[in-house]
Structures are given as C-alpha cells and as structure tokens.
Amino acid sequence: MRGIIKGVSNDGLGVLGEVLVPFAYPGDVVEVISTRERFGRTIARDFKLVKSSPIRVPGKCRYFGRCGGCLWQGLKYREQLKLKEEIFKRVTGVEAEIKGSPRIWFFRNISNFIVTVNGIGFKEFGMPRTVVSVDECPVFSERTKLYIRAMKRFLRETGLNPWNWKNGDVHYLQVREGKFTGEVMINVIAHIPPSGREELTEAFGFADSVYWSLKRDKRDDPKGIPTLIKGNEFIRESIEGLVYLIHPSTFFQTNSYALPILLKAVESFAEGSKVLDLYSGVGTFSLYLAKKGFEVTGVEVNEESVRVAKKSAEVNSLDVSFIPGRAEDAKLKGYETLIVDPPRKGLKDFSKRIAKEGPENLIYVSCNPSKFVLDYRNYLSKAYKIEDAVLIDMFPHTPHVEAVVKLRRR
C-alpha cells in the first residue's frame, strides 16, 4: 500500500487511509509493507519512506525511529506546534494558542532507563518487550552517557542481574536533574533490598543524592519504596526565584524550561485573593501563587508530596496551607478561584460536585484533552462556560501538550 500521509491521528500517528503510520507526517509519501492490529486499529509495522514531506527534518537522535519516546522528532518544530493546536481543537472544539518550549533539546529533568538483559535504554515503539539500548538522549541530558556507564559499572562490579521480563534484581535506573541548579538524583529501582552500597556510591560518586527503591511487584513501571543510600534527601530545582524540592516519591513537571510559562498562564487566569489548588502535588502552582500574593490552600492525597510541599514552603519562607487528603473530599466553598490539575483519567464524577459547589472562577490544567472535554461536556458545562485557554508545549517532539483552560460560572 502506497500513498500520501494526509494528517495525523489524535495520538500523533500518520494517517494513510485506514492505516496509522508511526514516525510519518503530513506530506510524506510512504509504502506500507506490513501491518498489525492493536486495540481495534491497523498500525504499520514496517514501511518505507518513498518521498519526504517538506515539513520533515532529520532526527537529532540516532535512535529516532526505533525508540518510542520521540514520535515527532523528525518534524519541524513550528509544525509540531501547529499540529498540537489542530489536535486540541479537534478533540475539544476549543481554539487555543500554543506557547512553545524555550528549549527543545536537553529539556527533560527526568528519565527512566529500563535495565534489561538486552541493554539499558528505552522501549521500542509498539514493542513493549524490545529495548533500544542507548548511550545518549538529546531530549534528556548531555550527561546520559555518564549515567549509563555508571549503571553498567555497578552491575559489573556487583554481579546483580538485570530484568529479563520475568525476574531479575535491577529493573530501572531513574535519573533526575535540577536543570537550573546542576544537582543530580540517582534512583536504582530493584526487586531486592539495597545491595552493593559501596559499589553504588562509587559508581555514582558524582550524584548529589543516591536512592535505592525496593519494587515489590513485577509491573513494568519505575516505582518502588525509596531508601536514601548517599547524599541529600532532596535535590533542588530553581524556577522563577523559587526553590522546589524533588524527592523520588513525588511528581514534578518534566520540562523545567517551559514550567515558568505554565506557571504564568495559571497566574494570569487566577482571580480574587483566595485560591484552592486541588491535586496540588509538591506545590508547583501553590508556591508560585503564594509568592505572587495569593492566599493559597493546596490539597493532595499523596502524603509524601504534602511533606515535600511543606518543606519547600519553609525553604522559600512562604505561608501556604497544604492539606493531605483526597481532592474529591475537599471543601469548595470560600474561594474565589479553584485550580484542578487531575491525573490523566480526569475528574470524572467529581466534576459534578464542582459544577454544583465550585467558585466563580475555575482553572482546569490538563495533559489529556480528551478527558478534559469529557469532564466539561458531562458536568462542568452545565455550570461553567469556557472563557479562555492556552496550550504550553511541555513535551517537544511528542504529540502531547499541556492545556490551561479558564472557566467562569454561567
């Protein structure tokens, strides 16, 4: 099957009739050699690029086209931004201007390298049990080779076994960087208690913080119970004059360079003086708004995130109230602005209560537009209307985008 890619799917695959083609862009002429069925869709397994689209550029990474991390790396950056606007409008019906990332290379502050018998790296696109072994990653860090080399040294000196998809000792190497502080956190995620402490601290002697996280299940994700092996409990990131503390058990926005744009977008949509920040995490929005003079209450179910948020407030000498608990149980009365930044699944039924009890001004932050629009159409639209929206490209070279939507009571 040969033809011209006419557009992209909502998840960023090139569209050729009924076939979806990864790493293909509008204007490309491709020949599909073989396909596979996945979740009711036909996806090209093997294809040839017959003629390049004028919006195509060479990938910067030598693993591009195999590694599943950067689907759009072969697309001019301004075209990436245009497509993200188009997809958002197609999914939500809302027109929103996108703000690009100040940096599109070496911008990620976290990377999870899977450690396997077949190498250390990332999963191949569409092949969850095939690993692309890497020694560089131009969207993460210029020091990737250093991190991979240190991990290999540690495995070699201890004789610990990498993951083989059924069992093994070490499963993931998670690395976090403070892009504006230069600090580094290493987190080895393993199926055994801390082992080879001396070898670990020597191999990663350059790190400011070294953790070992015990993984008690065999799910293929970088999660475990962390134990500090060496160095500082936290690393720091500096954003807009604020110090954010980062811990292995907590989430932090992955693009430190675009984060100020996201923070300013939320601030520009906030009204009044009293703000309720639900799903507040480590206080990303709460701390920034408090610095800007708002009276902020953050609610977060992850108690470790609450602990880190409180410590960050102390470090920054800010008066912010962080409450541990489910966002769904929070009291919504008495605030002029409500911020919600739910997980990818969205608000679901909680949006019904927000529609009934929420304040005049609602700010919905979402990395999953399809879930936002469900929440809006099912419940929020009965009480709120969309007043403004902006997109922030926190994820260059991928189809993903962060949306900030301002809603006002009807």
From Swiss-Prot:
Domain of life: Archaea
Activity regulation info: Activated by magnesium ions.
Protein's UniProt name: 23S rRNA (uracil(747)-C(5))-methyltransferase
E.C. number(s) listed in UniProt: 2.1.1.189
Organism: Pyrococcus abyssi (strain GE5 / Orsay)
Free-text function comment from the UniProt entry: Catalyzes the formation of 5-methyl-uridine at position equivalent to 747 (m5U747) in 23S rRNA (m5U859 in the P.abyssi numbering).
Family: Belongs to the class I-like SAM-binding methyltransferase superfamily. RNA M5U methyltransferase family.
NCBIfam families: rumA
Active site: 367 (nucleophile)
Pfam families reported in the protein's UniProt record: PabTrmU54_TRAM_dom, TehB, tRNA_U5-meth_tr
